């Protein structure tokens, strides 16, 4: 695959009961830290082109087209967030990646949080870009109270 005018990533696939997930990787060695980029809803792997170009040669890189997005289409819509996290784990196992740093944008951040919840010992780090926390313990009672009383902004 060509990104930022440089051939950086190898395209691979991962089969699920709902369809095929397409992902791209650049694996330097299994001892190198791996960055996993997860784009948000309606975005595809190209969202992270600049980051991939910057980190190439310094880190292992994996980026996917999320289930039912771009190259990962067609895809049956009978899955949930935790299925996505399990499939991500399957991809990481297939690539023999241990302790990645997951970088998720919007919906990709939710997948990263679900992965962290299911596999806390298999994660080196998590970076969220425009994703709200999934777990209640990250939101204060005051924030919940305020959110329930806000007028719609539309």
Q: Where do the protein language model's features map onto the residues?
A:
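N-terminal cap/lid segment of alpha/beta-hydrolase-fold proteins
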Residues: 2-20
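Flexible "cap/lid" loop of the alpha/beta hydrolase fold
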Residues: 113-118, 124-154
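Structural signature of beta-strand start/N-cap positions in the alpha/beta core
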Residues: 34, 60, 98-101, 122-125
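Active-site loop/oxyanion-hole signature of alpha/beta-hydrolase fold enzymes
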Residues: 16-18, 24, 62-103, 118
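Short, well-ordered alpha-helices that flank and scaffold nucleotide-derived cofactor binding pockets
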Residues: 50-53, 57, 90, 117-121
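Active-site micro-motifs of SAM-dependent methyltransferase domains
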Residues: 43, 68, 109, 133-134
């Amino acid at each position: 695959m060509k990104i930022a005018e440089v051939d950086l990533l190898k395209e691979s696939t991962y089969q699920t009961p709902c369809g095929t997930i397409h992902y791209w990787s650049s694996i330097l060695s299994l001892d190198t830290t791996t960055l996993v980029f997860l784009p948000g809803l309606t975005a595809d792997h190209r969202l992270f082109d600049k980051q991939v170009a910057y980190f190439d040669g310094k880190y292992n890189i994996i980026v996917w087209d999320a289930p039912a997005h771009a190259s990962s289409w067609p895809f049956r819509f009978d899955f949930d967030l935790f299925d996505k996290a399990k499939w991500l784990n399957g991809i990481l196992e297939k690539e023999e990646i241990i302790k990645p740093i997951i970088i998720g944008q919007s919906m990709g951040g939710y997948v990263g949080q679900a992965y962290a919840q299911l596999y806390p010992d298999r994660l080196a780090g998590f970076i969220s870009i425009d994703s709200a926390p999934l777990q209640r313990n990250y939101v204060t009672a005051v924030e919940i109270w305020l959110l329930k009383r806000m007028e719609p902004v539309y």
